[in-house]
UniProtKB/Swiss-Prot annotation:
GO terms for biological process: pectin catabolic process; response to nematode. The keyword Calcium applies. It comes from Arabidopsis thaliana (Mouse-ear cress). Belongs to the polysaccharide lyase 1 family. The keyword Hydrolase does not apply. Expressed in flowers, but not in leaves. It comes from the Eukaryota. This is Probable pectate lyase 18. Binds 1 Ca(2+) ion. Required for its activity. Keywords: Calcium, Glycoprotein, Lyase, Metal-binding, Signal. GO terms for cellular component: cytosol. GO terms for molecular function: metal ion binding; pectate lyase activity. Pfam families: Pectate_lyase_4. Glycans are attached at N42.
Length: 408
């Protein structure tokens, strides 16, 4: 056990010497960061030794933080301390009580019934929302979330599908974990409640799986997405401090839009981490499509695309590290990247770089800008693992089949 602990310690430290772990912005005193990291590693290793965790770790820092605990259902809110990247400070409903959803039907957008998911998410208090049993929830209108909420699907098979889906609008500290989100439709031209004290008229929604509109400190982890009317996950209108991790995405065209428009300057402060996701079967483009802002795309598995994987316009900074890109068997779709809506004379100054990516089946990444530009400091949020480890790091992406009383 001592040798195993020593190896784990050395492995983690070696990564951290070359890349800042869990930081969303550069820091003036790197030595203080190293000291803090040492404390975190020591605490983590000690805790895992005590609980016998070392034998089940995978190298995925999010999963290794909680999945080895056979009593995870008794410690649900510890998940909030496992986030990484730019959304690492999203605590969701960690400091609130547990709310159990018991009713999968009876969705009333204005007067939600207690026990329904809508009743839970509009409350003012922090809540950690779980589900009594397996259920499929078909919403009549978009589910407008209030701040400091966690939707935690572990222990049940929870599907939100067949209607409008989740909206995170001008709120903060949201965690969405362990649910299936698919076949989302447009809603709107209707009254919808957003808090216990307010409901209002909603225009037509886009039909996204998760729409983040002016939201901050958002973490979407271990969800399965497919086949929505617009995007699977879109973040626009000044949204920032977001981590999208361990998700499995399939059967969709425009997967992920990050940034409202080329002219919307508030998105210049957007920071998003995209880590340990599997972009799978039936996807076409936008994994993601970025505007303005800073985007860290790290240790994802790209096994399918038809047009391109990563694209953008309006001078976004894209830091691609340790990903695996398997190009399709389409002659003119081998390029990972797409610089959009600008001539080469302009986009060649945008800061896009590939570092340690594995490019297969003829895949190629077209870099631009300065490889050592200082802007990458704002697009670095965790230490990348080698691309050779992407398979095991992403092998359990998507909603997990967690059962109480056993490791998840």
């Amino acid at each position: 056990m001592k040798m195993q602990t020593k190896k784990l310690f050395i492995t983690i430290v070696s990564f951290l010497l070359y890349a800042p772990l869990f930081l969303s912005s550069p820091v003036p005193d790197p030595e203080s960061v190293v000291e803090e990291v040492h404390k975190s590693i020591n605490a983590s290793v000690a805790g895992r030794r005590k609980l016998g965790y070392l034998s089940c770790t995978t190298g995925n820092p999010i999963d290794d933080c909680w999945r080895c605990d056979p009593h995870w259902e008794q410690h649900r809110q510890r998940l909030a301390d496992c986030a990484i990247g730019f959304g690492k400070n999203a605590i969701g409903g960690r400091d609130g009580r547990i709310y159990v959803v018991t009713d999968s039907g009876n969705d009333n957008p204005v007067s939600p019934k207690p026990g329904t998911l809508r009743h839970a998410v509009v409350q003012d208090e922090p809540l950690w929302i779980i589900f009594q049993r397996d259920m499929t929830i078909q919403l009549k209108e978009e589910l407008i979330m209030n701040s400091f909420k966690t939707i935690d699907g572990r222990g049940a098979s929870v599907h939100i599908s067949g209607g409008p889906c989740i909206t995170i609008q001008y709120v903060t500290n949201i965690i969405i974990h362990g649910i299936h989100i698919h076949d989302c439709k447009q809603g709107g031209n209707a009254m919808v409640r957003s808090s216990p004290r307010h409901f209002g008229w909603r225009t037509i929604s886009d039909g996204d799986g998760v729409s983040i509109f002016g939201g901050s400190h958002v973490w979407v982890d271990h969800c399965s997405f497919s086949n929505c009317e617009d995007g699977l996950i879109d973040a626009i209108m000044g949204s920032t401090a977001i981590t999208l991790s361990n998700n499995h995405m399939t059967h969709h065209d425009k997967v992920m839009l990050l940034g409202h428009s080329d002219t919307y300057s508030r998105d210049k402060n957007m920071q998003v981490t995209i880590a340990f996701n599997h972009f799978g079967e039936g996807l076409v483009q936008r994994m993601p499509r970025c505007r303005h802002g800073y985007f860290h795309v790290v240790n994802n598995d790209y096994t399918h695309w038809e047009m391109y994987a990563i694209g953008g316009s309006a001078n976004p900074t894209i830091n691609s590290q340790g990903n695996r890109f398997l190009a399709p068997n389409i002659r003119f779709s081998k390029e990972v990247t797409k610089h959009e809506d600008a001539p080469e004379s302009e986009w060649k100054r945008w800061n896009w770089r590939s570092s340690g990516d594995l490019l297969l089946n003829g895949a190629f990444f077209t870099p631009s800008g300065g490889a050592a530009s200082s802007s990458y400091a704002k697009a670095s949020s965790l230490g990348a693992k080698p691309s050779s480890l992407v398979g095991p790091l992403t092998s359990t992406s998507g909603a997990l089949n967690c059962r109480k009383g056993s490791r998840c």
